[in-house]
Amino acid sequence: NDGSGSVFQSNSLANPHTWREEFTKKININNSKDIGKFDVVVTNPPFGTKIPIDDPVILEQFEIAYIWEKSENGFTKTTRLQKSVPPEILFIERCLQLLREGGRMAIVLPDAILGAPGLKYLRYWILKNVQVLASIDLHKDTFQPKNGTQTSVLLLRKKTKKEKEMEDAKSTIRKYPTFMAMVEHVGHDKRGNLTFKRDEKGNEKVISQKEMVKEESKGKIVEKEIETKTKITDDETTEISLIFKEWKKEQKERYSEYDF
């Protein structure tokens, strides 16, 4: 990329002052506290315990890279850095840093982040800083045949400074509705082979379409109507996105005090 398309490549976990100059100058970035320039972040970050981040220069940029201790109202950050942190955890905070107040993020994360007992402090931090708009549990074959990790997509909205101050004053986190769904069909199996929808008898469903084509007949070009049949990929992700849009409309009408 020559930069004209505003696409840049850098180690996004490194300190922002080390990012490529044409990028940092374009949006006036100086440090990790000065990167909230974006309205939307969509990401599928690398994850796994085999690629931990252990550079203290990188870790010290992130609140969730520190050790957190259980407290009366949740968890409290200490001044002690963890020895290493999986990259997906750091990417949650980095993406949040990149957002403006009220900005939205869609991020793919391993399910351990949502349920592992040792990561309660992380879930506490997430709920303190964002409104969870949706949690969508993906099928285990979603990234097969390359990766079988069980993952979810989280849709998040960055809370404003005012929102967080109000919650801190009451020592509570506001309750709000969250869209939840499970994707049971993703259009392929664990080997990567396409899967198709079937009827109650097990026959593959098809869509019949008529179209006009041109062909040569007796030295002349004539138009002819033909019927084509196309199998329907068994993928629920598009359907769930449409259901989510309808859900959002309903929530805006019912809960005007929340930003969906």
Task: Describe every region a protein language model picked out.
Residues N15, W19-F260:
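A conserved structural/catalytic subdomain of Rossmann-like adenosyl-cofactor enzymes
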Residues S6-Q9, A134:
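Short, well-structured beta-strand/strand-turn elements
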